[in-house]
């Protein structure tokens, strides 16, 4: 017979239960007493510190993982940002160089018109800038009876741009005029190539400060001249020296002026087509 069966009908079982209850009661009292004296309180703080430690360690691990992910994202962003600005700079440089090339080509074609506009706006090179025309100046000085005694030597110069197969020369070397007088000079141009060439000329007067008194009445500058192979033409220059040249103190000591022309090639056409067009004769059918 087992011990539990023997104790079932006896009082010993109730005794043991009471003993078990009384054994738990002092523990509770003891714990409460120690709690009042701080022992259980310290145990509670210990357990809390354990929980805080494990909680902080778990949060530390999460923070470390988030910091690692953030550093990886930052490195990727830096790598992308270093590649992206370089590509943007390359595209900007390409656009800039393309614009420069097109700008240079445009300036090449617009050089002569821009130079003409500049001369007309500033009076550079003897271009008439004042509102009074040359004819009005001549008439005004003729009526006032302006007399000048100073003689000015005007020399002529001719040049052609590189690659232009023209012979371009002044007919006369120089002309002597007085302020208030007009003079006529000629330039000769000849096409030495085997193809038609169209050219346009620019000019300048030196010294430049005397250019405002050098007025051209008739000139071939800034006008296209087309010459066939072997063709030669004479181009006149009719100019006038303002009488105020003599009274201007800035012109003291200036007795020589140089008028220079430079021809530039505008276009070159096909010689074969031109010759065929000029020599084309209608064929008559014979019966």
Swiss-Prot record:
The chain crosses the membrane at residues 93-115. One of its GO terms (cellular component) is mitochondrion. Residues 1-80 form a transit peptide. Keywords: Copper, Membrane, Mitochondrion, Mitochondrion inner membrane, Transit peptide, Transmembrane, Transmembrane helix. Pfam families: CtaG_Cox11 (PF04442). GO terms for biological process: pollen germination; positive regulation of cytochrome-c oxidase activity; post-embryonic root morphogenesis. GO terms for molecular function: copper ion binding. Residues 81-92 are mitochondrial matrix. InterPro entries: CtaG/Cox11_dom_sf, Cyt_c_oxidase_assmbl_CtaG. Residues 116-287 are mitochondrial intermembrane. It comes from the Eukaryota. The keyword Transit peptide applies. It is a single-pass membrane protein. The keyword Transmembrane helix applies. It is found in: Mitochondrion inner membrane. PANTHER family: CYTOCHROME C OXIDASE ASSEMBLY PROTEIN COX11, MITOCHONDRIAL-RELATED, CYTOCHROME C OXIDASE ASSEMBLY PROTEIN COX11-RELATED. Exerts its effect at some terminal stage of cytochrome c oxidase synthesis, probably by being involved in the insertion of the copper B into subunit I. Belongs to the COX11/CtaG (TC 3.D.4.8) family. This is Cytochrome c oxidase assembly protein COX11, mitochondrial. It comes from Arabidopsis thaliana. The gene is COX11.
